Amino acid sequence: MQKKFLGNTGIKVSIAGFGVLPMGPSQLSLPVEEGAKIIAYALEHGINFLDTAQYYRTYPYISSALKMGSFEDVVICSKSLCEDYDGMMDAVLEARKALDREVIDIFLMHEVRSGQLSLRQGAWKALKDAKKEGLVRAFGLSSHHVDITKAASSMEELDVVFPLINYAGLGIRKGDSFSTKEEMLEAISQCHAAGKGVFSMKAFGGGSLTGHYQEALDYVFSKPEIDSVMIGFGKISEVDDLLSYLGGTMDKSYNPDISKKRVYINQEDCEGCGSCKAACPAGAIFYNENGLAEVDHSKCLTCGYCSPVCPVRAVIMY
């Protein structure tokens, strides 16, 4: 698979990366050995870039996969939501131990929202120190927000940025409002021009765009400002689909079968705003005892109307 450098980091990654979140306990909850085999399969077929996070609880899948073969030049990115110095440094050390890696290639502040940069100065200092101490090779942030992505372009120490973008503009934020793919692409372009490594997330909008598989991938892979596209996988067949697409052998009419997909609402991200409930035509979304949204699968039509309106991307189709 074609590889590119992540900005000026000197780190070379496959143009498609493997997002490990879907196989973990937040979504599919695959047995570790089963998930590890999928990762190993992708590594064997040229994908060398893996994305995980402290929050995902997926380190065991990666650790097990790396023991299944002699894989060279594997690049691992992890992230943490910790805002303070000690919490972030502990997160880096936890990743090193859990992944059995002396150095974590990339470590990010996870899902930075508008107005949060000042709140995370302790975490930022920890990442700077971690790089100085040789614990990480590069550091930066991930965000769904245009203003944060734009700000990243002028952060001198920042090496990489991991923004959300897709052809439908789903989930792109700016302050407390939704934004557009055009605004996000402009922010990404500024990061790229500044020498920052850029790899993107949510090409399928959290699963909502999977039924437009090739259109979704055409959009992100056509952008020279994006060094790599992170795709979430939970099956070997999904890896094969991507390989077929990138290899140019996929039938132009092909779209994956999404008839068995289910809607899942991540309770740790949900804010109970009611947007998804209002959008559901089947009355399948209700509030639980904690005031958070859940899905009654006996009523759910899997129409996907709920996912695009969630301001924090807590609604996922898998």
Sequence positions of predicted segments:
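Short, well-ordered coil/turn segments that N-cap beta-strands
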Residues: 9-16, 46-49, 70-74, 100-105, ...
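Conserved short secondary-structure transition element at the edge of the structured enzyme core
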Residues: 43-44, 184, 188-250, 264-277, ...
